[in-house]
Amino acid sequence: MATSSSSYGIEQLQKGCYYEWMSVQAKHIVDLKEALMSHRSKEDHKLEELVGKIVNDFQKYTEKRSELSRRSCSSYFAPSWNSPLENGLLWMGGCRPSSFIRVIYSLCGSQAETQLSQYLLKIDENVEVNHGGSMSDLNASQLAKINDLHIKVIEKEDKITKKSANLQENVADMPIAIAAYATDLMNGDVVVEDALDKYEEGMAVLMVEADKLRFETLRKIVDVVTPVQAAEFLLAGKRLHISLHEWGRVREEQRFGCVRTDAAAATGGAGTEKSKRSSLLM
């Protein structure tokens, strides 16, 4: 794994990879909007090409992440480029693959999620979304396949989560316990470093496994649905991802804005009181 001297450089590469992907997603949203608005029933091949390109772009992104995580994976579990809101929703360095299917359920027209569906699918305030073969038209066979996929994905998520828990328990096990009571501090530090290196290597493996599950889940969903449905699903998912990033950023700006205001008020008050005391001494 990376040494402390190179960790910062690797984190910057990871951050650059993330923002590059966010830029690509923004372009995907524009392309999907245009494709859905201009779609004709006999032009599914155009949507198929676009959907295929987007899936391939996601695969390239996960492969690049995997390469960078093998060099240092710690940053992916609490990224500095994310807001606390986003980091609180992370699972193994990203979103849960099962959340992809939750988006589908939302788009299918559940009454409890109608407003969310309308927001996610909003292409333009003045344009109605009304495509033949949309997510609201999923048939029984498609729903059955998606439900089966949902169950399998959750099982795989649980397995990865359990592996992660085992790694965490191992870190606090014998190597760390022995180091805590080591009389030779230098030898103790070496033991701890070895244990933490093994932990980070193990977490990098699990993150790669999680990224593969994310990609495979996306690919299988696209295989089940029609080109129009796939485009709507991808548009909704990307809008949600970018919106979460923006919501988190705005919340932090508001929060830190309040903190700065309070701090300025406190500092100003102290300064005023100090000036009063000074004037009394003169």
Swiss-Prot record:
Domain DOG1: 11-254
A Pfam family assignment: DOG1
InterPro entries: Seed_Dev/Stress_Resp_Reg, TGA_domain
Gene Ontology BP annotations: DNA-templated transcription
Gene Ontology MF terms in the entry: sequence-specific DNA binding
Phenotype of gene-disrupted mutants: No germination phenotype.
Domain of life: Eukaryota
Protein name stated in the entry: Protein DOG1-like 3
